[in-house]
Amino acid sequence: MNKEALVNRLNASAKRQKADIVIKNGKIMDVYNQEWIYEDIAITDGVIVGLGEYEGENIIDAEGQMIVPGFIDGHVHIESSMVTPIEFAKAVLPHGVTTVVTDPHEIANVSGEKGIEFMLEQARHTPLNIHFMLPSSVPAASFERSGAILKAADLKPFYEEEEVLGLAEVMDYVSVQQAEKDMVQKLLDARVAGKRIDGHLAGLSTDLINIYRTAFVLNDHEVTSKEEALDRIRRGMYVMMREGSVAKNTLNVLPAVNEKNARRFFFCTDDKHVDDLLSEGSVNHQVKMAIQAGLNPFLAYQLGSLNAAECYGLDTKGAIAPGFDADLLFVSDLENVTVTMTMVKGQTVAEDSKAVYQDHASTAAPDQALLDSVKLAAPLNKQDFHMPIDSEQQINVIQIIPNQLETRLVQVPAPVAREFEPDTELDLLKIAVVERHKGLKETGLGVVKGFGFKSGAIATTISHDSHNIIAVGTNDEDIAAAVNKLQEIGGGLTIIKNGEELHSVPLPIAGLLSDQSAEQVNQSLLTLHDKLSLIGFTGGFNPFLTLSFLALPVIPDIKMTTTGLFDVKSFQHISLQ
């Protein structure tokens, strides 16, 4: 802001000149006092300059609707939507999300700095306020086969970008606990730059929470219970309640919220597919859930706006008051969170559930390196997935938990044969993680229980966080065909049965993002999910999203990597038997 702009706003606030926009006949939510205000809202240069009686060059009649602050998603990986930031904005703005804090560590794990630069450039071509946290753990663990490695020196220049708020979720807790040199430098660089540091404390003890707070880690979005939430609040953290496409923790954590500690809680989605964003929305859905669960509506809206702004130092976001950006929602039904109009900095960007602005997507095209990310040394065949076993020893199996990121380690008797073959009656399927960044010919094999497929295979290049190819299936031929299909289409999601493609969703940008519109991707995903019934899937959870987290070796208990089974609690690889 320059001097001229400030003078212009002061003149409008002092009523020496008309405001650019005045909103009349609205019921304004005061998230500070938790009460309603019945006054005009005066806006100049996209900023609220007054509440009271004002004249404006343009008048908007709210017609008695409630006006609330724009929602803030406190932690989201935009890449998990499978669309670019420009298309992501079109999906969430109609639901009232006006600000997001994003961690581009998905694309950074594939393409490093080029991936971050692409996301930053895309963000500049949308009215959605997109703030960035720099990926702290690329790869998530030192033994991972990611497409890039980001050291402290690689991240430091990005702190000069105005959109960057700090260091993203620190998930390599071993490096923090052991004060590993480069991790300490990352933490220091963020602190010296006056930035925030996000946490990732999945399943960690209170001793480790102490260590994280000592490292200036401010928040955690991996909380799954009231007890975990209170442990973090006691140690000065903010707690994000998460509701994504797989991890659905809001209702389990909500009982921890009370009138005394509510300002330390806010909402996030973390990972949410575009079909879910379009159908139910983002933070608006969590506000609705919280109200339905009995939370005071004023508190629910505060958790959806002000609290995240305070956590991240966004001092012009999260409330309707002079000096704040005019990020406003017109709401016709408070409890159902029915958003009829969304404004960002005084501009109407969505109305009647649709985005109403023009973007400039063509000026933010991806670098060619992002379009060539699936690099297998050669096409795979069924022999590449053979899995010898000892029939006298039990097999270590990954047991999935529907709609959760955590898994369990179970043991089952080995079959008499000397080689493992999937057993659909026992729901024991084969899982494979195939390195796809450098053509290393490295494949980890294991057994997984809980998908319930009766035939065929599925595979995807979305495989947190290193995003190698991950596949699960009932036979080696279809697993090989699924992996090869992903190389053919440049990454994405696919279903194979009897060697034939049932449906695929291409994601050519880093194997993570589509170059199509949100609506087009949504339609393709609907077709994909419809086809799952042809391989025996009976529903209840999203198998692709569940599969995509089975290679993340920082969330308990047991995961798969390109080098085999990994026990998260002992933080070491274990054998199949």
Swiss-Prot record:
Cofactor names from the entry are: Mn(2+)
Q: What protein does this entry describe?
A: Adenine deaminase
Key words of the record = Hydrolase, Manganese
Record's signal peptide: none
**Similarity comment:** Belongs to the metallo-dependent hydrolases superfamily. Adenine deaminase family.
**Reactions the enzyme catalyzes:** adenine + H2O + H(+) = hypoxanthine + NH4(+)
Pfam families assigned to the protein according to its UniProt record, in alphabetical order = Adenine_deam_C (PF13382), Amidohydro_1 (PF01979)
Q: Which NCBIfam families match?
A: ade
Q: Gene name?
A: adeC
Please provide, alphabetically and separated by semicolons, the GO molecular function terms listed in this UniProt record. Answer: adenine deaminase activity
The reply to whether Hydrolase figures as a keyword in the UniProt entry is yes
Stated EC number for the protein is 3.5.4.2
Q: Which Gene3D superfamilies match?
A: Metal-dependent hydrolases (3.20.20.140), Urease, subunit C, domain 1 (2.30.40.10)
Q: Give the matching InterPro entries.
A: Adenine_deam, Adenine_deam_C, Amidohydro-rel, Metal-dep_hydrolase_composite, Metal_Hydrolase
One BP annotation, GO: adenine catabolic process
What is the superkingdom listed in this entry's lineage? Bacteria
